[in-house]
Amino acid sequence: MPVSIFEKESRVNVPVDALFQWHARQGAIERVTPPWAPVKLIRRSGGIETGARVRFRLAFLKIPFEWEAEHVAYEENRLFMDRQVRGPFRHWTHTHLFAPDGEDAAWMKDRIEFQLPFDVPGRRLHRLAEKELDRMFAYRHRVLENDLAVHSRTLKRITVLVSGASGVIGSQLVAYLRAGGHRVIRLVRRRPVPGSDELYWN
């Protein structure tokens, strides 16, 4: 089966460096993950720079699986690229492209090259995969644009203590604040992980 290409492009009303930095922060993956396809982060080493890896558990087309991706290219304010090391696709490369549009706006494009895990007669499964990608990336771009619109209203970064940070609302609040550049301290009822932004509450 040939490699397919999916692209989604949006114009965002923030400078290109702010758009790129948002992607590099903790919380970005969690923020752009649609609620119908929840992701559980298992392990992360590094950020979005070349050599960084991320492993998580998720579902695509309602099929659960573990996914591991490695970042293989990085040019600040221009692009970063990750490829599937382990997961459901025969091939998957995701290139995140950025370009300035004047001083106060930028274009971003998600370009995915993918190959389904097995050969299927006809194009029904392929069309289903493209439809799901279109739905997911429409959601991702909308959330990113809305978050950046709010974050760009102030340059002040603050420290926030969050209780209930592991719940549905709390986990999204933590991701939203971190992706916006704020420091978040999670109030936890267990012993804090050494070196983490956690505070024990008994």
Language model segments and positions:
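Short, surface-exposed coil-to-beta transition loops
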Residues: 5-7, 64-68, 91-94
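Rossmann-fold cofactor-recognition segment
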Residues: 192-202
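Glycine-rich portal/gate segments that line the openings of hydrophobic small-molecule binding cavities
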Residues: 30, 40-88, 103, 107
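Beta-strand/loop substructures that line and gate deep hydrophobic ligand-binding cavities in soluble
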Residues: 72, 79-134
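A short, basic/flexible loop-to-alpha-helix module at the beginning of a structural domain
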Residues: 145-158
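Hydrophobic ligand-binding cavity/cleft-lining segments
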Residues: 1-49
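Conserved glycine-rich Rossmann-like NAD(P)H-binding loop of the short-chain dehydrogenase/reductase
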Residues: 182-189
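N-terminal Rossmann NAD(P)H-binding glycine-rich loop of SDR-like oxidoreductase domains
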Residues: 159-180
